[in-house]
Regions:
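Short acidic-aromatic active-site loops that bind/stabilize oxyanions
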Residues: 53, 98, 102
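Secondary-structure boundary elements
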Residues: 28-93
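Leloir-type glycosyltransferase catalytic cores
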Residues: 171-193
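Hydrophobic/aromatic-rich core segments of domains that either
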Residues: 103-177
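Short, well-ordered strand-loop elements centered on a beta-strand within folded domains, enriched
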Residues: 89-91, 96-98, 145-151
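Catalytic cysteine-centered active-site loop
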Residues: 83, 87-91, 98, 119-131
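Linear, non-domain "peripheral" regions
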Residues: 1-44
């Protein structure tokens, strides 16, 4: 795994004293209390839903479906940045039931790590398109191949407000992602080892 979700941070500040001593202050996304609660919830969900005879793909699908079926997209945070939920972290979907793309991605990454499956977060920031916000999703190594896994887009907000589950972005290749998104979203152009 490339970067563990719990190592994510929002701010880094360095201070140099008169004696040239450097102090670094890091604002992490997760507190120790949140990490403990998240780990307990991951263990609980895993034990209730995953069996030893499942294939890796079945395990991923089970967790994918569990997270989506128990999470609502946090429209408030996406619209104006204000929300009472920790939806941008794994805490949101796992303990509060709300997520933005970062929350879905971090939650899924924690389960993939528990399964021993290599993964990393793919971040897309459009260069010239002001109509699209940045987006993140998981890249997953399965059977020596890399696939895209996007729980956010598999948990769409329907116009009638109803929740539903889809698998359109479940373990798809880069070529499949390009075809689905009509080349609008930058995707992985090289192979990862």
């Amino acid at each position: 795994n490339y970067v563990h979700p719990f190592n994510g941070f929002s701010n880094v500040k360095t201070v140099i004293s008169e004696t040239r001593e450097i102090t670094v202050f890091i604002d992490y996304f997760y507190t120790n209390e949140e990490i403990k609660a998240i780990n307990e919830k991951v263990d609980e969900i895993y034990e209730k839903n995953i069996t030893s005879n499942m294939s890796d793909e079945d395990k991923i699908k089970t967790i994918h479906d569990y997270i989506i079926n128990n999470t609502k997209y946090d429209v408030e945070r996406n619209n104006d940045g204000k929300s009472p939920y920790h939806s941008y972290t794994a805490y949101g979907p796992l303990l509060e039931g709300y997520a933005t793309c970062n929350g879905y991605t971090d939650a899924m990454a924690l389960f993939l790590i528990k399964m021993g499956i290599s993964n990393f977060k793919v971040a897309m920031t459009p260069e010239n398109n002001q109509d699209i916000d940045g987006h993140v999703w998981n890249a997953v190594k399965l059977n020596n191949e890399w696939y895209h896994l996007d729980l956010t887009w598999d948990d769409p907000v329907s116009s009638d407000g109803k929740d539903y589950l889809q698998h359109k972005y479940f373990l798809i290749t880069t070529q499949e992602l390009k075809e689905i998104d009509d080349g609008e979203v930058p995707v992985l152009e090289h192979q990862f080892k």
